[in-house]
UniProtKB/Swiss-Prot annotation:
This protein's encoding gene: aroC
Pathway field: Metabolic intermediate biosynthesis; chorismate biosynthesis; chorismate from D-erythrose 4-phosphate and phosphoenolpyruvate: step 7/7
CDD domains referenced in this protein's UniProt entry, alphabetically: Chorismate_synthase
Name this protein carries in UniProt: Chorismate synthase
Pfam families xrefs: Chorismate_synt
Residues bound to FMN: 125-127, 238-239, 278, 293-297, 319
Phylogenetic lineage: Bacteria, Pseudomonadati, Pseudomonadota, Gammaproteobacteria, Enterobacterales
TM region positions: none
Length: 354
């Protein structure tokens, strides 16, 4: 009911706030026998970690994960896996001036109206800091899917503002702080971020995720369609405002003769559907795009109200990302992995004997 859990067989429950003592999660449903250590989770956590680039937030957190349960002699036991990450570099005093104000574009207003109380320090539970535990849980799913089924899940920055970044190379994605696959776009991205920092503003971004070697049959129509669950998971990420699957919204300009993925004995000729038909994976790569809004915490003064419903001006202090898309790549990968892991285990439970 409280919306802190995702999944039916592979279940992930997260807890913690941006400026609380720690972040944590419980992962239930991991099959036994998977070799797993903190090192397996730390790689993706380091990719998401704040303070690793001059282009992201200056908050510096080691994000070192500890495994509390579910592992014995280096392998999963099939019981619940408990993970925890302690917060270190939180500066709650940065938010003391706005504790009675509602930051426009944030969850301050809606949390206050819904619960009658909110943690104003860094956004509390609504902060993107919460996604660290999703990345840790997603790393477990990614490892299992890859080792047992050869499934790979990778993402890259495909647009920042009006800078389009077409795919060029997966190797290049990990060679720059933007997760951009096109080296020719790096200078333009750098200049844009520098300019935004100078004027105290922010920009939106688009992330593309591609999952390969997906077996046919994942997804449960009607209400648990694979594309519906993937959209739900991706839209649950902070600042996500839109999801496209396959050709997405460009289908409105296509004709049926163009969009349909014709089939031959060798397989599908095209992949306009993004690897999902009728809510079920068709064996082609799953292609997704997520649009992220500009960061709402900026230095530019803006209009808002306080708790007394009085009109005021607000300038948000603190340490914030000029573009949340820069750290969204491992988060989107994690959410796709969690959904695919859950659906694969559900498929195995229902259809393994056919």
């Amino acid at each position: 009911m409280s919306g802190n859990t995702i999944g039916k067989i592979f279940c992930v429950t997260t807890f913690g706030e941006s400026h609380g003592e720690a972040l944590g999660c419980i992962i239930d449903g991991t099959p036994p026998g998977l070799e797993l250590s903190c090192k397996d989770l730390q790689y993706d956590l380091n990719r998401r970690r704040p303070g690793t680039s001059r282009y992201t937030t200056l908050r510096r957190e080691p994000d070192e994960v500890n495994i509390l349960s579910g592992i014995f002699n280096g392998v999963t036991t099939g019981t619940s896996i408990g993970l925890i990450i302690y917060n270190h570099d939180h500066r709650s005093q940065d938010y003391s001036d706005i504790k009675n104000l509602f930051r426009p574009g944030h969850a301050d207003y809606t949390y206050e109206k819904k619960y009658g109380i909110r943690d104003y320090r860094g956004g509390g539970r609504s902060s993107a800091r919460e996604t660290a535990m999703r990345v840790a849980a997603g790393a477990i799913a990614k490892k299992y899917l890859n080792e047992k089924y050869g499934i790979t899940i990778r993402a890259y920055l495909s647009a920042m503002g009006n800078i389009k970044c077409p795919f060029k190379s997966w190797q290049e994605v990990e060679n720059n702080p933007f997760f951009c696959s096109d080296p020719e776009k790096i200078l333009a991205l750098e200049n844009l971020i520098k300019y935004l920092k100078k004027i105290g503003d922010s920009i939106g971004a688009e992330i593309t995720i591609i999952a390969e070697n997906i077996p046919v049959g994942l997804g449960e129509p009607v209400f648990d369609r694979l594309d519906a669950d993937l959209s739900h998971a991706l839209m649950s990420i902070n600042a996500a405002k839109g999801v496209e699957i396959g050709d997405g919204f460009s289908v409105i300009n296509q004709r049926g003769s163009e969009h349909r993925d014709e089939i031959t004995p060798q397989g599908f000729l095209t992949n306009h559907s993004g690897g999902i038909l009728g809510g079920i994976s068709n064996g082609r790569e799953i292609v997704l795009k997520v649009a992220f809004k500009p960061t709402s915490s900026i230095r530019k003064a803006g209009n808002t109200i306080n708790k007394n419903n009085e009109k005021v001006q607000i300038v948000t202090k603190g340490r914030h990302d000029p573009c949340v898309g820069l750290r969204a790549v491992p988060i989107t990968e994690a959410m796709v992995a969690i959904v695919l892991m859950d659906h694969l285990l559900r498929f195995r439970a229902q259809c393994s004997g056919k």
